[in-house]
């Protein structure tokens, strides 16, 4: 905070635009491999435009992000250029205002799609039949497109007594038939998405309860 105040004072003394302050924070937010870079703007960002670049960790060359040059918003979708889960990436942002004043570049933390993305829980669809409960799972589409060969689901069946059973389903178009259930009994179910080779899983989905026939 003291350093920030000193920088503000220096800018005022030199009569330079406030945009020359470094951006305060760059942060990747990644859900289901949709990788969005967010940044906190300078204190006075009126009429500022932002320019975003990216590179692979270890590579010398910075590349412009298409669609994120001269933008006024405070975020940029880098999913297309940070799509390889085996790589690590950096991004950087600088601000510009008319007539041509520019801030210094601000660097993001190093980012890994594989390790930093969060996995969304799937959506459960339940049907009741004379034979029991039919469970279908709808995963997030971006995750299926990216990782469908490595996905599976854990299904949790909770009995009235509180006892819990666990089942597994493969991705992505299968259904699970739960036949060993009692008639006219309430059961609650949850599911989570698992990426096996990464040992990564989502939170459990919201609980859905049904009563058998």
Regions found by a protein language model. Name each.
Residues 51-85, 154-182:
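Recognizes extended acidic, P/S/T-rich segments that occur
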Residues 76-102, 176-201:
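Beta-strand-rich modules
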Residues 149, 159-213:
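Membrane-proximal extracellular "stem/stalk" segments
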Residues 33-45, 78, 131-148:
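Conserved aromatic anchor
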Residues 38-42, 50-55, 89-98, 136-142, ...:
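Structural signature of extracellular immunoglobulin-like
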Residues 98-118, 196-213:
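Extracellular fibronectin type III
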Residues 1-26, 47, 51:
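N-terminal Sec-dependent signal peptide, specifically the hydrophobic helical h-region
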Residues 21-27, 117-126:
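Proline-enriched interdomain boundary motifs that mark the N-terminal boundary
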């Amino acid at each position: 905070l003291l350093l920030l105040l000193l920088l503000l004072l220096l800018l005022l003394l030199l009569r330079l635009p406030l945009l020359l302050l470094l951006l305060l924070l760059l942060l990747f937010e990644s859900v289901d491999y949709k990788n969005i870079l967010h940044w906190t703007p300078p204190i006075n960002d009126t009429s500022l435009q932002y320019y975003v670049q990216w590179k692979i960790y270890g590579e010398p060359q910075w590349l412009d992000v298409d669609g994120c040059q001269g933008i006024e918003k405070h975020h940029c979708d880098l999913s297309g250029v940070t799509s390889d889960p085996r790589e690590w990436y950096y991004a950087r942002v600088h601000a510009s205002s008319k007539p041509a004043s520019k801030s210094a570049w601000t660097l993001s933390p190093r980012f890994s799609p594989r390790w930093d993305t969060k996995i969304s829980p799937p959506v459960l669809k339940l049907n009741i039949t004379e034979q029991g409960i039919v469970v279908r799972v709808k995963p997030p589409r971006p995750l299926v497109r990216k990782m469908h060969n490595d996905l599976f689901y854990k299904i949790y069946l909770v009995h009235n007594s509180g006892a819990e059973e666990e089942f597994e389903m493969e991705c992505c178009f299968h259904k699970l038939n739960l036949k060993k259930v009692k008639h006219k009994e309430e059961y609650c179910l949850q599911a989570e998405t698992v990426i096996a080779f990464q040992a990564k899983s989502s939170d459990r989905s919201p609980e859905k309860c049904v009563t058998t026939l």
